[in-house]
């Protein structure tokens, strides 16, 4: 089931219209792409044009269905005061529709500026890849994690927050952590997962002139 589900997700994403290079994240020295997204914890929209003149760190995450991304957003909130004191704005783009995101963060507020991008267009514009699964028997060289065989993905084991009793396969770890958090995916979360389940994450520091200064 896992094999067929992820091949379907990967095929669906591959048919979409990507903005920018979907497998090569922007690098230092390159111009940050234009974006304008609705704010989750503010009124109105936030855009690159509106941020010009101020350096900012932007994190591009999966949706709320991903327990690892929920934790990374919290961690980003912990470093926000230090970044703010250095004159750097902190933004997090989450792959969840606006109203669903607002409901969640109403009860779990964060000091960082949250933006909603259910279509992952900003992720694509910054070149943040999704996992592309190689056909079975392919001679292409895997480039983990952006390009992998299904066998490699199924064999992977993760426990980055050390909350699990032992490292688990990525999708299995999602289920365990969501259960630990008491987080139940609703229809909106399920739809986002079905469309963007293989999306990866990225962080970019953009200077006051709109140029990428650091990327991870």
Language-model segments: residues:
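N-terminal targeting signals for export/organelle localization
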Residues: 1-38
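Catalytic metal- and UDP-sugar-binding loop of GT-A-like glycosyltransferases, i.e.
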Residues: 60, 93, 206
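Structural microenvironment flanking redox-active thiols in thiol-disulfide oxidoreductases
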Residues: 72-125, 162-163
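Thiol/selenol-based redox catalytic cores and closely related redox-interacting motifs
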Residues: 117-216
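Hydrophobic alpha-helical segments, especially N-terminal targeting/anchoring helices
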Residues: 38-40, 206
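Short loop/turn microsegments at loop-to-beta-strand junctions
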Residues: 33, 55, 200-202
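Residue-level signal for well-ordered, solvent-exposed loop/turn and beta-edge residues enriched
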Residues: 30, 43-44, 211
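Short active-site neighborhood of thiol/selenol oxidoreductases, capturing the structured segment around
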Residues: 46-77, 89-90
């Amino acid at each position: 089931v896992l094999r067929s589900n992820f091949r379907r997700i990967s095929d669906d994403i591959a048919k979409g219209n990507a903005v920018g290079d979907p497998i090569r994240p922007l690098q230092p020295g390159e111009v940050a792409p234009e974006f304008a997204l609705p704010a989750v914890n503010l009124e109105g929209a936030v855009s690159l044009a509106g941020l010009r003149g101020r350096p900012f760190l932007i994190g591009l995450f999966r949706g709320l269905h991903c327990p690892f991304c929920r934790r990374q957003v919290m961690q980003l909130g912990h470093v926000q005061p230090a970044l703010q004191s250095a004159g750097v704005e902190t933004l997090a783009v989450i792959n969840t529709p606006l109203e669903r995101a607002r409901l969640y963060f109403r009860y779990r507020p964060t000091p960082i500026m949250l933006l909603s991008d259910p279509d992952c267009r900003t992720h694509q514009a910054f070149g943040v890849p999704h996992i592309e699964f190689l056909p079975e028997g392919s001679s292409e060289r895997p480039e983990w994690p952006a390009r992998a065989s299904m066998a490699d993905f199924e064999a992977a084991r993760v426990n980055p927050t050390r909350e699990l009793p032992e490292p688990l396969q990525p999708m299995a770890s999602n289920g365990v952590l969501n259960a630990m958090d008491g987080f139940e995916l609703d229809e909106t979360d399920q739809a986002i997962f079905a469309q963007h389940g293989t999306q990866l994450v990225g962080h970019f520091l953009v200077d006051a002139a709109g140029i990428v200064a650091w990327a991870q």
